[in-house]
Regions:
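Core RecA-like ATPase module of SF1/SF2 helicases and allied nucleic-acid translocases
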Residues: 6-167
Length: 169
């Protein structure tokens, strides 16, 4: 999975790593999104002296990371490049961390064409998004999808989960 995201798909098919989505039926275990996100972050966005980062719980948010909003927040202010402003970042919105101020208290996150500033106390609303569950990916589109699975709970290992992962290609 790491090699596919880091070199094989970008080099052989011209698909940038930020347009590749790894999907798993579960969050837990070796092939769950928690483990996959740790490994993918280390491979695709490792620490560097010129990258600021912020630790929150077990997560390390770093400039350049792909992140997902995990609950609706109707109060987050955002601004588009053309100056249009609005509020609301919603469960499942995926973006990337463009900037973390040196103190680590403010993070600038770009969601498609909207830029929002998050304070450190809002980090509970974010998760890494290099890998996500099939459930969270519903309704999204990606240039390339890598479906990762290993033996899991019987309820997760059904034909419908594979079907849902395939329709996101």
């Amino acid at each position: 999975v790491l090699e596919l995201c880091r070199t094989r798909l970008p080099d052989n098919m011209g698909i940038p790593a930020d347009q590749i989505q790894v999907l798993s039926p579960t969050r837990r275990g070796l092939t769950g999104t928690v483990s996959l996100n740790r490994a993918l972050q280390a491979a695709l966005n490792p620490p560097a002296p010129d990258k600021h980062q912020k630790t929150w719980g077990e997560l390390i948010f770093r400039e350049g990371d792909r992140v997902m909003q995990t609950r609706n927040n109707y109060d987050v202010l955002w601004q588009k490049d053309d100056g249009e402003m609005g509020t609301g970042i919603f469960n499942g919105d995926v973006g990337h961390i463009a900037k973390i101020d040196p103190s680590g208290e403010l993070l600038e996150i770009v969601f498609d064409d909207r830029t929002a500033v998050y304070t450190a106390d809002m980090l509970a609303e974010l998760d890494m998004a290099y890998a996500m569950t099939v459930h969270k990916a519903q309704g999204s589109e990606y240039r390339a999808v890598i479906f990762v699975s290993a033996p899991a709970a019987p309820g997760l290992m059904v034909r419908g989960v594979l079907y849902l992962s395939l329709i996101h290609i």
